[in-house]
Amino acid sequence: DFHTHHLDAPAGSAIVNLPLEILSGATPFAPLPDARYSVGVHPWWSSLPPAELAQLQQQLLLWAARDEVVALGECGFDRLRGDWAVQEQLFPLHVRLSEAYSKPLILHCVRAFDRLLALRKHYRPTQRWVIHGFRGRPALARQLLQADFDLSFGEHYNAESYALTPPSRRHIESDEGRLPIALLSTPTIERPEGFNEKV
């Protein structure tokens, strides 16, 4: 399970995305042995007061260095929710941490693929950028794959987009729902060469 919000996922079975209350420090949290986590400032949180956002960024710096954190994100852009200008300000920090700690970037993207494509071209990252919960059409999937993005597929997905994505570039996730059973039965899911061994 490449990306889930279920904190009770069995240790080692998933990359668990830590929620706002844990990242902010409002809720005490002790990572489980052998568990794997991702941390990031979600674009929906971009409407929070500036002081809270500053605190989140400080906490992100601390969490990103931890061994049990194997990915940054989810982060990214959402044209329908949150403060776009703040989302633009938050994104570079995630890229820097992803590169500094050699951890992939898990991306939330709603109606902003043009921006992500431009940013990938600008940064030329060495780490994988993975679009989570991808449900776009084949034309968009091809465009993203050609730009070197990975795609992660969840409960709702475009079957043709999934089929055209090379096994080494696709992932499956439950997000806030369930793992897609049809994809679980597909034997071609592989660990990408060179991908973080903990992922």
Language-model features, listed with the residues they occupy:
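Mid-domain alpha/beta scaffold segments of enzyme catalytic cores
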Residues: D1-V199
